[in-house]
Amino acid sequence: MRGGTSKGVFFVDTDLPQDPTLRDRLLMRIMGSPDPYGKQIDGMGAATSSTSKVVILSRTSRSDSDIAYRFGQVAIDSPHIDWSGNCGNLTTAVAPLAISLGLVKAPAEGIATVRMWQANLGKRIIAHVTMQAGEVVEAGDFELDGVTFAAAEIRLEFLEPGGGGEADQGDVAMLPSGRVLDLLDIPGLGTVELTLLNAGNPTVFIAAQALGLTGTELQSDINSRPELLARLEAVRAHGAVAMGIASSVEDASRHHRVVPRLCFVAPAQDYQASNGRPVSASSIAFNARIISVGQLHHAMTGTGAIALSVAAALPGSVVNRVLKPDTETTHLVFGHPSGTLAVGAHLSQRDGQWTVERSVMSRSARRLMQGWVFACV
């Protein structure tokens, strides 16, 4: 399935071993991992963080959900699947596939509203999927920067995305430190201002200027500079420790490579997207770039977009401070390497604490193939 700007291999839980160790061993072999050559030639993966992903669908007995799913980020060069976070892009593909497989009921015509349970994070998500003649509509005119072809729009609502976390991590607060802005000492950078946020996925936000960057960089500007990538990883790893996700920076870099993400932001500027299309500062509220598993993402992760929408609405956050004046945070557009993306968040204060009611965005998804996959285990 393609979901948003990512691709992954989807399974139904009853088709997989129930033992987690056996399940993960099979999934890694299907994807072609671990591969010391970094290519996943002998599997279904495509050797990037955006394409080395698996999703497992399962029926649910929860009264507030129609389908449950788990997301796994499959390491390319090491024998590991990280089940600690979510992929907001592949979330888009869960509902249409569940409908097509008969796992959930949907109207023959109109909009199917599918309530999803994200089992990694313990969060509810609602997808709105267009139906026609009893089938999911995939063709359409919705354009998503980072995806070449237009498709049908799928609107997503992430309900109360702030806080939460893996079962073995406990319930992590939306602002783990209790502050909108934190000061951390990073070797090679000195004292830097960060916003540490748990919404969508745990994310560390930093101003591009603090890194000596403009915020308009493309993949070739970042991923070809190992010394810069090491500096970015140092910021992310220190943020992971401050958020309580890792016990040390070494632990963060070795065992927590997927979350937290690192996102750097800058005021709106003109730039050229990766497809050569100009993006004008007048069309966006700010610029954002996100690091995914050690590399600059080609567009924007779905969960990164959620975190950005929430951070933008938090007064005084790193993201909020680069917004254009009078930006409406319930619907804003930001720039990323492949173009632009519209997101929005609805926040409120209760007893002096910020809470997120929902974050919304639109993506698209398409079934690329369905059938048997073979693996030698």
Across the structure, where does each feature detected by a protein language model lie?
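A glycine-rich beta-to-alpha transition motif near the start of alpha/beta enzyme domains, typified by
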Residues: 1-377
